[in-house]
């Protein structure tokens, strides 16, 4: 091999290694809460002033609220999908915000609500089942043929039976309908090409089958996908991820459930009978998004909140462990935890912790959990101060600490 060829090969190896590292170093940031739509002047404009701070947390992706016109102000009862004038701001405001995040090398993830949809008009029978897409042509202008025939609240539907769970607040859309598949796929691609979105968060993904989600993912080719399957059964989540394929991941509700109970004096639960983590990260860490709270479980809804005095123990866990961690807006800005969260995220980045990093659980007892991640980081959570001799090897130094948590990293990095 010639000198120049060897040099080129060496450079190629370096570039490929860097690309692989960047692809693995992912932190998702949820950029809204349940009350964000109430912000005076619009949430999108308000968020322009937060881009720099969000970037400083180490976030690589930001999850934004549902983009379309909606009957509910929060965006989860969408109607005219192409109409981007919502309670969060205008389409122009949204596009400008996405560009601002892109300027900081942060990819934007759209909250995609396609299980159900609200109609604009009644038909001749007086039933709300006539949809308008928000354009001057007939794209997404649907009727009873596009509603599931077994919808319990809108039984006037003439489509196929639902492929997933029902949703009472709005008509369930027939995802087996070729027109629905074609036009929703076109809309998703429009969100990518016209707005600049790079990925999808699939709302209420239990409402339609993984096979249907796969169609939209395959047709729109997002770089990032995470499904919301509000369930503690990790087998259900694993089956969905495998069924969708490609870049699909799922929010790790099993880990949230176990962790928020374990930090209250039952940390022995953080090691399963197989010696691995008990949540989805114990099975498919590269396909898992871990989180502490979101706009449903926390915020003002508080449907399933993490213990408020132990939130930072939760972040010490997810930000140093396998999986893709998700940081919640409220904790950074409303709870004033930005400094502590950023310190943990920095440890993650500096040590190259990625979704598939190795996890060696050293201790999992009532008031103590200790684990080594990627061979470079050791994390302790729990109230016990004395963790025992020889647990922390020589050559490790404290990198981040707070109330009942501490993180060490190898010296000399």
Swiss-Prot record:
What InterPro entries does the record tag this protein with? A-amylase_bs_C (IPR012850), A-amylase_pln (IPR013775), Alpha_amylase (IPR006046), Glyco_hydro_13_cat_dom (IPR006047), Glyco_hydro_b (IPR013780), Glycoside_hydrolase_SF (IPR017853)
Task: State where Ca(2+) 3 binds.
Answer: 151, 167, 170, 172
Keywords of the record:
Calcium, Carbohydrate metabolism, Germination, Glycosidase, Hydrolase, Metal-binding, Signal
In short, the EC number is: 3.2.1.1
Q: Where does Ca(2+) 2 bind?
A: 132, 135, 137, 141
Hydrolase as UniProt keyword: yes
| Molecular function per GO | alpha-amylase activity; calcium ion binding
How is the cofactor bound here? Binds 3 Ca(2+) ions per subunit.
- Biological process terms in GO annotation: starch catabolic process; sucrose catabolic process
User: What residues correspond to the site Transition state stabilizer?
Assistant: 296
Q: What else is known?
A: Binds starch not only at the active site, but also via accessory binding sites on the protein surface that are important for efficient binding to starch granules and thereby increase enzyme activity.
In the record, the note on similarity to other proteins reads: Belongs to the glycosyl hydrolase 13 family.
| Subunit structure and binding partners | Monomer.
What the protein does comes down to: Important for breakdown of endosperm starch during germination.
This chain's protein is named: Alpha-amylase AMY3
User: What is the gene name?
Assistant: AMY1.1
């Amino acid at each position: 091999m010639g000198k120049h060829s060897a040099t080129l090969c060496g450079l190629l190896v370096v570039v490929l290694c860097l690309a692989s590292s960047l692809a693995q170093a992912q932190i998702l940031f949820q950029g809204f809460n349940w009350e964000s739509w109430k912000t005076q002047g619009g949430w999108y404009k308000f968020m322009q002033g937060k881009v720099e701070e969000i970037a400083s947390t180490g976030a690589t992706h930001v999850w934004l609220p549902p983009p379309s016109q909606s009957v509910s102000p929060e965006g989860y009862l969408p109607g005219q999908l192409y109409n981007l004038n919502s309670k969060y701001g205008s389409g122009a405001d949204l596009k400008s915000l996405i560009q601002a995040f892109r300027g900081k090398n942060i990819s934007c993830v759209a909250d995609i609500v396609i299980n159900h949809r609200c109609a604009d008009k009644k038909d001749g029978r007086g039933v709300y089942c006539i949809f308008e897409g928000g354009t001057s042509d007939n794209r997404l202008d649907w009727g009873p043929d596009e509603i599931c025939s077994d919808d319990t609240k809108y039984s006037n539907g003439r489509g196929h039976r639902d492929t997933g769970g029902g949703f009472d607040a709005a008509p369930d859309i027939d995802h087996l309908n070729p027109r629905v598949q074609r036009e929703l796929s076109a809309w998703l691609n429009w969100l990518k090409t016209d707005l600049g979105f790079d990925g999808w968060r699939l709302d209420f993904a239990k409402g339609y089958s993984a096979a249907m989600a796969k169609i939209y993912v395959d047709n729109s080719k997002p770089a990032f996908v995470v499904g919301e399957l509000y369930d503690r059964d990790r087998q259900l989540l694993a089956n969905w991820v495998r069924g969708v394929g490609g870049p699909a991941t799922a929010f790790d509700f099993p880990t949230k459930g176990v962790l928020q109970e374990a930090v209250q004096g039952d940390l022995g639960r953080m090691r399963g009978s197989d010696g691995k983590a008990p949540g989805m990260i114990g099975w498919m860490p590269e396909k898992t998004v871990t989180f502490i709270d979101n706009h449903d479980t926390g915020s003002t809804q508080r449907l399933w909140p993490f213990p408020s005095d132990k939130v930072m123990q939760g972040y010490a866990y997810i930000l140093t462990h396998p999986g893709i961690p998700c940081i919640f807006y409220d904790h950074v800005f409303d709870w004033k935890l930005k400094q502590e969260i950023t310190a943990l995220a920095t440890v993650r980045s500096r040590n190259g912790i990625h979704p598939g990093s190795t996890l060696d659980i050293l201790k999992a007892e009532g008031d103590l959990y200790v684990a080594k991640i990627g061979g470079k980081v050791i994390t302790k959570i729990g109230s016990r101060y004395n963790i025992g001799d020889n647990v922390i090897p020589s050559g490790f130094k404290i990198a981040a600490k707070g109330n009942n948590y501490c993180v060490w990293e190898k010296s000399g990095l």
